[in-house]
Amino acid sequence: MENYPFDTTGLNTDTIDRFNKTYQALREEFKIEPTGHIDFDLHQFKAFRNCLDVNVRGSFVIKKDCGDSYILFVEVHFKIGEKHITHHQEFQVWGLTYLKNNFGGVVIRRETLTDKILELIHPHELDFDEDKPFSNTFYVVVNDHTKASSCMNRDFRNAVMDIRDNDFLIEIVDHTLIIGNYDPIIAEKSIHIAEFVERLAGAC
């Protein structure tokens, strides 16, 4: 029986293959190694707030001189429906890194037409007048405008702009940043996630 660097208990063959292909693709691009057990406290993030359970199936560190970043293989359980409730299970890949500065609470995602309309009625989005391309592309909600606007400098915004994927969510709680999406596991998307967190971790 093959040994995998992640927990395969109860996983079907397709999920194991997807995780393994992603791991192998990451190994080709980055110097990664398993972390062993670390509690990343994912329940603090709104991205997982509606989940009944969040289980890290595998965690891997990308080593840099200036700081480490992480790739997480995550299993989530949540409920769908109100009257007729069904339990749903998904497997996802998320990136995580620790930031030097305290950003407060921040959520960043691609801006939709609905966001633009709502912003006209109830303005609460953080915009950067000096960086219209960023503000026109991303929807940014924060709980502390002073912290977020000072920490989200040009280098940070450029890193977000350079992500080679359209469907992602970034969330920051104080010094901890995660990035991921709710799509099925795809190795190429995981590479884009890893590129972003490695870039932030390497910003001395």
What are these regions (language model features)?
Residues E2-C204:
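Charged, low-complexity intrinsically disordered regions
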